[in-house]
């Protein structure tokens, strides 16, 4: 089975700064709108279209109290998709109040938190749910209701989270692409009797030791990665409870950047996951302003072919080009190869640049190749 996606888009952004009548408040309004098109090289196995166009709107409202430390950010999101009703959806990416005093920071509302250092996968990144209809690589996330306290001390930084509500993963509908047959049901199952109202907790400690940045994290609550159960002729996502311990390490040694993410997760199954590797940067290629990063990573999951994610015994190799021009042109390309099955691999290309101060273009291309029926990508 082979699938290829090419996705191109334009981004229009504008910013307006407004000062309220009261001198102690400042308001900033900005936002973006983008036109996106996905093109597949072949029709879907269930007859889905080869093309898929959509519009995205993402305004941003920022408020800051100039005579105090309070600030509030509100970022709503909406996508209209011409083909897939399930991909047409809205979300509150952020509605977060921040205040700080001394060594302490308090955030409350809806927010996004990213943990991770590696390129090919982010094992330790467990706070936010994946907005799976948005991107193939799982980088897009839904906003997460939270209370987040940060304590910054000389001995390190600690982050404490209370997560009072769970967000279900989004999935493509019947007319959408990159889905199983039948489509995944919107009727989710939960291990906890509290379902989406289960209160989750998370903690992270981080500190710089010279050129090495080390983080240790713990999460207890509803697993963001669903299992799948066949019920009544439907594939239903099943959200189990889990505990996870994670560690992420990133260190700079000359032009080398070494990375590690390692987790142990206790959920419906118990497993260990590892992503580790390096990125070497060739600065000023042939006396030019262009920098090239050479990336290599190894991915391991102790569940083998029973893993719910890609990368149980795989290697990733890639190149990152930074052209260092005034348009901020960047290109990333890479390939992940399954070491157990030579016919299982996927490749990606990401490229972006500014047209002017208001317009930006971006292209994402993905190739999936698989002839092994028991592999997740099949």
Language-model segments: residues:
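Detector for outer-membrane/organellar transmembrane beta-barrel domains
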Residues: 253-338
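Residues on the lipid-exposed face of transmembrane beta-strands in outer-membrane beta-barrel proteins
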Residues: 57-63, 94-99, 147-151, 203-207, ...
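Transmembrane beta-barrel strands of outer-membrane/channel proteins
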Residues: 31-39, 74-78, 108-110, 160-164, ...
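Repeated loop/turn-to-beta-strand initiation elements of outer-membrane beta-barrel proteins
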Residues: 29, 67-72, 103-106, 155-158, ...
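Residues that define the transmembrane beta-barrel architecture of outer-membrane proteins
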Residues: 49-57, 88-93, 141-145, 152, ...
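Surface-exposed beta-loop-beta
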Residues: 177-273
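Outer-membrane beta-barrel translocator/channel fold
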Residues: 36-48, 83-87, 107-142, 293-316, ...
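Outer membrane beta-barrel
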Residues: 68-176, 210, 370
């Amino acid at each position: 089975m082979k699938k290829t996606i090419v996705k191109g888009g334009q981004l229009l952004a504008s910013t307006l700064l407004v000062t309220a009548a009261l001198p102690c408040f400042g308001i900033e309004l900005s936002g973006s709108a983008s036109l996106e098109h996905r093109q597949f090289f072949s029709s879907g196995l269930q007859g889905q279209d080869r093309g898929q166009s959509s519009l995205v709107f993402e305004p941003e409202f920022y408020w800051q109290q100039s005579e105090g430390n309070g600030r509030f950010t509100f970022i709503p999101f909406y996508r209209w998709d011409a083909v897939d009703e399930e991909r047409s959806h809205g979300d509150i990416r952020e509605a977060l109040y921040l205040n700080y005093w001394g060594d302490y920071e308090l955030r409350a509302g809806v927010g996004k938190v990213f943990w991770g250092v590696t390129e090919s996968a982010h094992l330790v990144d467990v706070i936010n749910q994946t907005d799976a209809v948005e991107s193939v690589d799982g980088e897009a996330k839904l906003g997460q209701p939270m209370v987040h306290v940060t304590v910054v001390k000389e001995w390190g930084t600690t982050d404490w989270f209370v997560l009072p509500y769970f967000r279900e993963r989004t999935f493509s509908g019947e007319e959408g692409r990159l889905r199983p047959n039948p489509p995944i049901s919107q009727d989710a199952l939960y291990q906890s009797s509290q379902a989406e109202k289960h209160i989750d907790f998370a903690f992270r400690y981080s500190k710089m030791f010279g050129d090495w940045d080390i983080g240790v994290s713990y999460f207890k609550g509803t697993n963001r990665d669903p299992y799948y159960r066949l019920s009544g002729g439907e594939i239903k996502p099943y959200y189990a409870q889990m505990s996870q311990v994670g560690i992420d390490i990133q260190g700079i040694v000359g032009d080398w950047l070494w990375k590690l993410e390692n987790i142990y997760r206790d959920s419906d199954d118990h497993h260990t996951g590892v992503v580790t590797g390096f990125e070497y940067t060739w600065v000023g290629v042939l006396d030019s302003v262009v920098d090239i990063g050479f990336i290599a990573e190894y991915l391991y999951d102790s569940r083998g072919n029973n893993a719910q994610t890609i990368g149980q015994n795989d290697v990733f190799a890639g190149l990152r080009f930074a052209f260092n021009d005034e348009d901020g042109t960047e290109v990333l390309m890479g390939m992940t190869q399954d070491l157990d099955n030579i016919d299982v691999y996927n490749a990606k290309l990401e490229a972006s640049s500014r047209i002017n101060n208001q317009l930006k273009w971006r292209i994402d291309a993905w190739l999936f190749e698989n002839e092994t029926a028991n592999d997740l990508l099949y």
